[in-house]
Amino acid sequence: MKNSIEIEIPEMGKIKFESLRDTNKKSKNIPIKNSKYIKTISYNELEKYLNNEYILSLLKKRNKIRVFESKAINMISRYRYDVFVKYYYVQSYITKTNYKLAKEIYLEHIKSFNNFSEPDGRKEKPEDFINNFNKLIKNIQKDGIDKTIIPITKNGEIIDGAHRLAIALYFNLKVPFVMFDLLDANYNKQFFINRGFNEKYAKIIDKEIVEKNNYNIDLEGIKKWRKKIIQKYLWYCVP
């Protein structure tokens, strides 16, 4: 496989894919830390779990696919800044705090990402994204995330499922995932800013979610954030 390649994606333009390594990921074997094998499924079953024909078309067909799971905190990455934006929305939606601002930031980052249009055609305007996300939050809050699977690259970067990962992160859930030999896309903070995401919104996300103004996620930062999330989760569960 080539070290890097540019692919034209509808509504997004040319996106560079390369081999990336985040400090939150392992360098050998299963890239997601503290992962556990849970089952093997067929390619047809994967289609049901993904429910996204466009993403499925990118994945190499295999007869048997091994499914693993790990805590959502182990799957975050500096290369997926959008997960933190989505987390801020989930937090505001659930707690009913700063929701108007969170909605503005969420829609701004979606606009800079794909201009409110996804390759599978299921979401084509801002209201579609808001309604779909709200429904997803309610469903996962009620039923968990076991009915879906998130595909990742061999380096541990998610290929699809940023909304689901953000919700799982908020509720401290374990996330089922499968690995595919694909290159990684660098959707870091600068990616969004370069495409029009307002820097004042980025500063809010850095302060409220990432807790590092320069957004340099390191192992110590991950540990501190994990502790805070677990504390919040325990508080949320107390009747």
Where are these regions (language model features)?
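Intrinsically disordered, low-structural-confidence terminal and linker regions
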Residues: 1-41
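Short linear elements at protein peripheries
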Residues: 2, 9, 30, 40-44, ...
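Periplasmic/luminal catalytic loop of GT-C fold multi-pass membrane glycosyltransferases
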Residues: 31, 39, 43-60, 208-212, ...
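Extended, charge-rich helix/loop segments that form flexible
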Residues: 55-116
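Ordered hydrophobic segments in well-structured contexts
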Residues: 149-152, 166, 176-178
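A sequence-level detector for short glycine-anchored, His/Arg-bearing signature motifs
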Residues: 155-172
